[in-house]
Each structure stands twice: as structure tokens, then as C-alpha cells.
Swiss-Prot record:
Presence of keyword Protein biosynthesis: yes
Keyword presence, ATP-binding: no
Role description: Attaches a formyl group to the free amino group of methionyl-tRNA(fMet). The formyl group appears to play a dual role in the initiator identity of N-formylmethionyl-tRNA by promoting its recognition by IF2 and preventing the misappropriation of this tRNA by the elongation apparatus.
InterPro entries to which the protein is assigned, alphabetical: Fmt (IPR005794), Formyl_trans_C (IPR005793), Formyl_trans_C_sf (IPR037022), Formyl_transf_N (IPR002376), Formyl_transf_N_sf (IPR036477), Formyl_transferase-like_C_sf (IPR011034), GART_AS (IPR001555), Met-tRNA-FMT_C (IPR044135)
Domain of life: Bacteria
Source taxonomy: Bacteria, Bacillati, Bacillota, Clostridia, Peptostreptococcales
Pfam families recorded: Formyl_trans_C, Formyl_trans_N
Name of the featured protein: Methionyl-tRNA formyltransferase
HAMAP family: Formyl_trans
Amino acid sequence: MRVIYMGTPEFAVAPLHSLIGNQYDVVAVFTQPDRPKGRGKKLQSTPVKELALAHGLMLYQPIKLRESSVVEIIKSLEPDVIVVVAYGQILSKEILEIPTYGCINVHASLLPKYRGAAPIHRAIIDGEKKTGVTTMYMDVGLDTGDMLLKKEVLIGADETAGELRDRLMALGADTLIKTLNQVQRGTLVGEKQNDLESSYAAMLDKGLGQINWNQSAEAIRNLIRGTIPWPMAYTTYLGNRVKIWKSRIEESEVSGKPGEILKVEKSGIFVKTGQGTLVIERIQFSGKKPLDVREYLAGNTIEKGVLLGEEDGN
């Protein structure tokens, strides 16, 4: 089976590795162009590019996949299937119709829930207890094609988006191989999605991580877990931005304003929320490394009564 693989971030590495390991004929890899990153703005390769080069695969990094010259290249490769995993560009109808077996996508949710760019993060932020991966035939819509295989997992109570991503990446790689084997044998029939059950997982931005202390402790803790490792949940302490890496919930209701520091112990910083108390266990001030509260308090102080999220703390 001649495969063209299209993918870009870390999540797309394991499926490509699995294709190579299972001796699929990967005739070309398409990934996003190198982008400037970091303070020095040096061009950085995508994780998929690095794997493709390590295995000597033919590599393409078109700025626009829809350009006629790129479409002609894809046609000339005569793919049996195009596999797409978090590529970052939309495939035109013309491209979708090129492969013999169509274009197959690995999506990190139980479709039709959480269509879109950030299904892993949004599932945790929304407090979902389970998620998974879905393989599907691609059509011109956004994650709207007929579903092929679904694999479900439970989301751990303390699991972060980064940890869940790693689990779903491995599950996606395994599910992709099973999907391709069944598609090639003709034993797999696509199932249409129910649009009435669909939801959309919008792309993340830095502002998403700002904590609203009027929300419940549970909602804030879900935000913290769902934004690790990026964009990170944050608040301010006396005007200084603080990222929060770890927290737990205390159910006891006490008086105070949302965002108010109720008490400070080595085990954590107790903060009043709209419902319940959030205990912050690991923090990171701007320009500093993450520290457990116990470590931070060894050389610093946190004042009781300060309102988090207020520029002056009052």
C-alpha cells in the first residue's frame, strides 16, 4: 500500500513511526514549513520532518497544499491512501479524490464530539471523564467525514493535557494500523457522524489560561490540567504573573472573596473560589522555574488575605 503521510506536531510522530515499523510503503511525507521559534527566532523543523529525514523519506513542506504544482506532485506519487494526522492545512476536494482508498485522518476525540484543533485540551477543561481517538474518511468539512474505528480511554483524575496527548498518540498509531489493514481488506464500512451530537474544540490561545476565581474549584483545576504544557493556567499575585502547575480541591466552604488567599501551608496555598477551595501545590513566577509551594516557601513568603488576579492584591 503506497502511503502519503501528512502531519506536523509531536502527536503525529508515533503514527508515522508505526507506518514505517509495519513496513508500509511511505512514498512521501508532507509537513508544515520550518517556522522561527524562540528568542533568537531560529527556524525550527517540525517533529514529523525530523523523523522523516531520519528514515530517508521523501519530504515536502509546501506553504500552500492547494497550489496546482503541489497537487500535481501528489498525483504523480500515485498514493493508495493519504494519512493525515494534525497536519495543519486543509485538503482540497481535488486532493481528497486522488488516493484509491481515500484520505484517512486520525483525530484525538470520540467524534462527533470535539471536532477541531484542540480536542485533547478541551476535553479536560470541560471536565470530561473519557475521550479517545477516531479514524475517519476525510471530506471537505472539518472533521465531519465517515467514522471508521473508535478507541475509548478514561481520563485520569490528575491527568494533564500533555500526559493525555502522549497516551492518545500511541493509541492513535495503533488504531491507524488496524484501520488501514481493514480498509485494504475491504472489511471496514464508514459510519456517518450525527451532527446533532457534535461539538467544536476551538484552537487554544494564551488568554485561555487566565483564571477566573469566580468559577468553581473544580472548573479551575480542570483548566490548570487542560492547559499543561501550553498555554498554562495563570493568575497574578501582587501584580506578578504566576503559572499554576498543580492543585487539589478542598470541598469545605469558608467565607472570603473569590481569589482570596485563605491560608498558606507547606502543602499548598488555599484559595477561595466561586465554589469550594483550591489548594495550589506547584507554582512558577515569571522568569523562574516551577517549584512546589514547599520549596518556594523555603526562601519566600506568600501573604494570607491577598486577592489573586488583582493587580495590587487588594
